[in-house]
Amino acid sequence: MAIINIKSKERKPAALLFFMFFSIVSATITGASVRDAVFLTQFDKSYLPVMFITIAVVMAGVIALYKKLTAGQDQIFVISISGALFSISLFLLQSNLSGLFIPVLYIWMEVVTILSIFQFWILAGEIFNARQAKRIFTLLGAGGSFAGMGAGFGIKPFVSTFGSENLLFLTIFFIGISV
């Protein structure tokens, strides 16, 4: 890996983090697709500014609670518990996607996205020191770029085969892989 400049002892953690970020970004893209499609079929687009403001307010509370609950905790433990919570909650929302659960999904997908990416970069920062990060973080970010391409191209065939109502299960799958 001389082109990428990764030392032999860094290969395994770099590869794992690459695929972890690939999975997180894939979950984000598939989840956002479901969130947007379901919301915009049931609610007028004029409600989007309200959703954006609500997300900001909710995230302020979530971040404060997150900091309190995770202080001093092992990052891998936090990611594992969060991944389980995210997967279970999305599964429950999937089975109740009507009425007020649609805006809840819209907001919750943003919470899942922000916390997952936040947790990933904290973990990457714990694994690699600043010197290593300068060399390796570009590769990790590429995992997200590949996910953008893969998920972007893969959503249409997935929906054609399994139906749009099952796209949230793909999101749950990617969250599970990322843990």
Regions found by a protein language model. Name each.
Residues 7-38, 104-111:
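Pair of pore-lining "gating" transmembrane helices in MFS-fold secondary transporters
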Residues 34-35, 113-129:
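Intracellular juxtamembrane helix-capping segments at the cytosolic ends
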Residues 40-47:
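Short extramembrane helix-to-coil loop segments that connect adjacent transmembrane helices in Major
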Residues 41, 71-72, 126, 156-162:
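Membrane-helix boundary and inter-helical linker elements of multi-pass secondary transporters
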Residues 49-61, 132-155, 159:
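Glycine-rich segments within core transmembrane alpha-helices of 12-TM secondary carriers
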Residues 71-83, 161-170:
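Cytoplasmic membrane-interface "Motif A"-like loop-to-helix N-cap segments
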Residues 83-100:
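C-terminal ends and interior cores of transmembrane alpha-helices
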Residues 150-179:
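Helix-loop-helix hairpin linking two adjacent transmembrane segments in secondary transporters
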